[in-house]
Amino acid sequence: MNFFDRLFKRKSKASIPPMPSWETIVEIMYDKHLDVFSDEVVKVIYSKDSSMRFVVLKNKKGFFTYQLESIYQYDEDEWKYIGSQDNTLPAMWEPFRGIVGKSVFESIDELLKELKAEPEYKSYFQ
């Protein structure tokens, strides 16, 4: 094979694994992406089916806050593009309904009391 043939030879398409079932995705995503937070992760509370989670965070000043996240499963086109790369997860955690506003609490007990009053907590976590 001469130089130009090697230079312009197309890479063979990598095989794309099939999209896992929803149950498998939920299992795979358990405790994933907790390292993306700049604050310390103190506690993670999962919904009954583990597809949602409250992440309790503590900042450097000692204040607590939380974020509600849900699993976003990539659609077919996204998976065709992303799935060919090594070590790719079929989903990601994202803020639930895009809500990122947070309250700040001085103690974790105060936070947990407020968290349990959230309508999402009552619907998906109890």
Residue ranges and their predicted role:
Residues N2-M52:
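Negatively charged, low-complexity tracts enriched in Asp/Glu with abundant Ser/Thr
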Residues D5-K9, K80, E110-K113:
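Polar/charged alpha-helical tracts
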Residues S38-Y72:
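Amphipathic, interaction-prone secondary-structure segments
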Residues E40-V41, E78-E110:
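A short, exposed loop/beta-hairpin motif centered on an aromatic-Gly-Thr core
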Residues R6, I71-Y72, D77-K80, K102, ...:
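A structural signal for the main folded, soluble domain(s) of proteins
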